[in-house]
Amino acid sequence: MNIDCLCRWVVLPLLRYPLLVALVLRWSLSDSISICLTIYTLLINAFLIANSYIKRSGQVAWKSLREFKNGIVLITGGSKGLGRAIVSQLLQDYSNLTILNVDICPSSVRNTRVKDLICDLSDDEEVAALLNLLKRKYKNEIRLIVNNAGVRANFTGFNGMERDNLDKIFKINTFAPLQFIQELAPSRHSTRQCYIVNIASILGILTPAKVAAYAASKAALIAFHQSYSFELQNEGVRNIRTLLVTPGQLNTEMFAGFKPPRQFFAPVIDITTLAAKIVRYCELGQRGQLNEPFYCSFAHLLMCVPYSLQRIVRSFSRIDCCLPDE
């Protein structure tokens, strides 16, 4: 049991359908309160339905990935962790897609539709050579780009950061996604449909101690993604849609080795569950942001509250003192 379960099964139903909850629980309500709750329920659900429609709609109908006979999916960092879970989910859901996995090591997923492209994303020459290959052989068939690859430095204080590590982290976490989008996304006037997913991190918003380099690289990715998305929206681009994923801690190797505090409020996310949600968004062509777990939807709000409240929340959550020294 955690806060996500309570919100999903108690808080959100109560907020969306208060009158229905009252009827189920046989609460005694006056006529005026019942009318107000009915109007509220209709308005809030109308807004949520309209919001979902806007995120998924466009002047041109969005095609299912199943409609592309020789569709190509490009994913970085698909050999382990969340990337591997996304690859497995795509293979399970679609029999028509070929997946190009860009990683420093081969994928452990054994399938003829998965093609490994070995590349160190921190090496400029290797990235340039790979991009030339992709543009020559696959560019016009790429329907989905998932920028998932990410690395972190050792957990260390601000003064312990090294320039070489900073360069490597930013090249992989920030600059590589930009290059892949710039070189492989369709032009604004093309008819080729393409969905772009950038996997960031809630640490790019909350910026805890000892992960300054990683948090900064993800913060930069978030800013680049949002600016790019608003640019597409402003220019009326119809064939490109984007999704920003800002997860909390995942059950992967990257942040393994310590027990996260306050898991009731900040539960560790199962990568299989998150991968299924990401693939579902890809299928629907849903724009916007995917935040998991629940608290991630309020991270920006936390960073906007008065300093004293921030200190209280951060002290309670132990976000700045939970990471070990490495």
UniProtKB/Swiss-Prot annotation:
Molecular function in Gene Ontology: oxidoreductase activity, acting on the CH-OH group of donors, NAD or NADP as acceptor
Primary location class: mitochondrion
Protein name per its UniProtKB record: Uncharacterized oxidoreductase TDA5
Deletion phenotype: Leads to cell death when overexpressing the camptothecin mimetic TOP1-T(722)A mutant.
InterPro entries in the record: NAD(P)-bd_dom_sf, Sc_DH/Rdtase_CS, SDR_fam
Coiled coil ranges: none
Membrane topology: Multi-pass membrane protein
Residues bound to NADP(+): D120, N148, Y214, K218, T252
PANTHER family in UniProt: AER111WP, PKSB
Active-site residue list: Y214, K218
Keyword set, alphabetical order: Membrane, Mitochondrion, NADP, Oxidoreductase, Transmembrane, Transmembrane helix
Pfam families attached to this UniProt entry: adh_short
Transmembrane segments: 9-29, 33-53
Its biological purpose: Involved in the resistance to DNA-damaging agents.
GO biological processes: response to xenobiotic stimulus
Note: Present with 2130 molecules/cell in log phase SD medium.
Top-level enzyme category: oxidoreductase
Sequence similarity: Belongs to the short-chain dehydrogenases/reductases (SDR) family.
EC number: 1.-.-.-
Gene: TDA5
Single GO cellular component term: endoplasmic reticulum
Location of the protein in the cell: Mitochondrion membrane
